[in-house]
């Protein structure tokens, strides 16, 4: 599987989703720009080798994560939005309810495998709640790849952020200003369709702090 990187915007929104619902399990989707066809002669791992860059994060649900009808509605709407913006659903993230549980459960593996049917380099990202602090001192994620029909954890020491010092600084600033209170997930959108799950205000805040 190619390398995986998250933009500051994608990482921060994932962190804010967990911060808004600290006592619940939360999940969401990660989107990447549509890839151009690769040239076959490029060497693996060489300078021309590609990686998946998650440019944005779409928060899905909090609390109960396994309701299939709601997930289908979300996937359909988000897939349509991705096509309009030349994106593709390329990953799934989840934070479990229990603080010390950072392993993917059946729901996480099932949704990620569903995404992998349409995007071969899908990543499953688990948020490690034990590393979650208001100062965001270290990255809080574990990245899993689909290998031989199983989800396996990638190197935990690898830097999966496109610019970690920036992501650390901005996520800490957003937490300090309680920006998570304005974050909208798909559950919030289903409660009131005026709630925008693309979170334009948070996107602007991240851009302003960059």
From Swiss-Prot:
Protein's GO biological process: protein insertion into ER membrane by stop-transfer membrane-anchor sequence; tail-anchored membrane protein insertion into ER membrane
The protein's matches in InterPro entries, at most eight in alphabetical order, are given as: EMC8/9, MPN
Query: In which broad location class does this protein mainly occur, judging by the first location in its UniProt entry?
Result: endoplasmic reticulum
Query: Matching CDD domains, A to Z?
Result: MPN_UPF0172 (cd08060)
* Stretches of the chain forming a coiled coil according to its record: none
* Membrane-topology annotation of the record: Peripheral membrane protein
- At the top level, the lineage of the source is Eukaryota
Its localization reads:
Endoplasmic reticulum membrane
Q: Where is the MPN domain?
A: 4-150
Task: Please provide the record's keywords in A-Z order.
Answer: Endoplasmic reticulum, Membrane
In its keyword annotation, does this UniProt entry include tRNA-binding? no
Q: How does the record describe its quaternary structure?
A: Component of the ER membrane protein complex (EMC). EMC8 and EMC9 are mutually exclusive subunits of the EMC complex.
Q: Name the job this protein performs.
A: Part of the endoplasmic reticulum membrane protein complex (EMC) that enables the energy-independent insertion into endoplasmic reticulum membranes of newly synthesized membrane proteins. Preferentially accommodates proteins with transmembrane domains that are weakly hydrophobic or contain destabilizing features such as charged and aromatic residues. Involved in the cotranslational insertion of multi-pass membrane proteins in which stop-transfer membrane-anchor sequences become ER membrane spanning helices.
Know the name of this protein?
ER membrane protein complex subunit 8
Q: Which gene encodes it?
A: EMC8
